[in-house]
Amino acid sequence: MSRQDGNAGGNSWNGKTRGSLTGYKIFLFFIQFLGLGFAYLLLRIVTFYYYLFAAKPRIVLLDFYHNTLQISGKTARKLVRRNFYIFGQTLVDRAAFLLGKDKEFTHTFENEEYLIDIREKGKGGILLSAHLGNWETAGNLLKGRITPTINIVMLDAEVESIKQYMELSTGGSRFKIIAIKNDLSHIIAIRNALINNEFVAIHADRYMEGAKFTELDFLGKKAKFPIGPFIIASKFDAPVTFVFAAKDGKYSYHLSATLPITTKMKPEEIAKLYVAELEKKVRQYPEQWFNYFNFFQ
């Protein structure tokens, strides 16, 4: 596939993303000139090959489905194949949005009014999400519909040549990226965004070795979650909601938001609420769990 999360099959995420510039070029060409349908058809071939030869992520997912979600072996194998295919679709969809083909997609938004209420309060909003579904596409859908500006906090881990090609070929993302850096400048950027009544979206599911964490029960097992996103959610005087975007049809997405947290809470308290919601989403969309490493220590 054109992008794979680093350390697939390892014990924690290493923050790196691998990708093929040639792969991006091929799919961008097909999307632009032959359409999404043809790109999806090509994707079936690519992901079948990936399923056969990418042993580590395949084994990790099989273990997750079988031993964590208690799904039978045959069904688990089908889920793994579907997982790889939908993950590929999310990458194709992301490129399609950036190429201006957003009208080919439809979406529903569960509790959209929560985000509208957050916007009206004028304090900005912190949106915690996970590597489940396709948050980048959600960011593209939200901009202009609910807020003029949305910021996504992430490790700037894409291969630079791919990032440059995507910017050159598509005109760039419709949302701002706040890169996490060692000098903590991202904290200042988050603060400024909230002051300007902007939304700030953060993935809160991936723990990196050596980072501070909170250990919580998740799907019946102990798992480490990064404490940083929850400290940010607790520190700033802005409403906090958990937002997810799952693919629910060939060209459609289902977005959802939880009732905003507007009272002061400890980071660990917010983390527990987040994990409870994440559990629901994983059970609802098991084929869209895109963490290809051993999530449980």
Predicted regions and their residues:
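Membrane-anchoring hydrophobic helices of lipid-metabolizing enzymes
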Residues: S2-S129, R174
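Non-catalytic C-terminal accessory region of glycerolipid acyltransferases
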Residues: F53, G144, S173, L184-Q297
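Conserved beta-strand termini and adjacent loop/short-helix elements that scaffold enzyme active sites
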Residues: E110, V153-L155, I180, T258-P260, ...
